[in-house]
Amino acid sequence: MEIRLAHPNEIEAIVNVLEEARAFLASSGIHQWQGEYPNKDNVFDDILSGRGYVGLVDGKVAAYAAVNRGQEEEYEAIYDGKWRHNNPVYTTFHRVATSNEFRGQGVIQTFLQGLIEGQKGPDFRCDTHEQNKVMRHILQKLGYVYCGKVPIDGERLAYQKIKHKNERSLYQEIDEDDRWLLGKN
């Protein structure tokens, strides 16, 4: 997977990924993203401000996320819990989505781990809808810990991960052509 900043000519592909994610959430009975948000304007702003990232598989937009660095007002208003560490600067992931073509293949976990490894600083935060058990499970697999609730679109569950120095994933993507290196030819 190639992970990089999104380009303006990818807006339509990214919006399509977000629309597919919205439909998936609706079909799963999850009331997250069932209004106008997220939309093309959000993606456009993300790209112009240098915080929109894509994960590409075979040149196709497979995943998207907005990466914010700094404090966020809603995150400062955490309740029914507290952050494990109160770092003044942290990284948050928003609008995390994958396309239907790559759903269920571990793309989001790989994408988020790659983003974590590529960002400076140890403090990573993310929020999700209480009903979004898939995202909650992915965050926990990545080492995030539930910390409380934040006032975003009513209420969202807030998670935090403290990255260990030089953290690298426990898995490695192996190109099909390189499988012989593992003695599986």
Question: What are the residue ranges of the model-derived segments?
Answer:
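Conserved beta-hairpin
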Residues: 49-68
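Conserved acyl-donor/pantetheine-binding loop and adjacent beta-alpha core of acyl/acetyltransferases
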Residues: 66-97, 103
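Conserved active-site alpha-helix within GNAT-family acetyltransferase domains
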Residues: 130-148
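C-terminal "cap" of GNAT-fold acetyltransferases
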Residues: 152-185
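A short beta-loop-alpha structural element at the N-terminal edge
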Residues: 2-16
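Conserved GNAT-fold acetyl-CoA-binding loop/helix
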Residues: 22-42
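Conserved acetyl-CoA-binding loop-helix of GNAT-fold acetyltransferases
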Residues: 98, 104-117, 137, 141
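Conserved GNAT acetyl-CoA-binding A-motif
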Residues: 112, 118-130
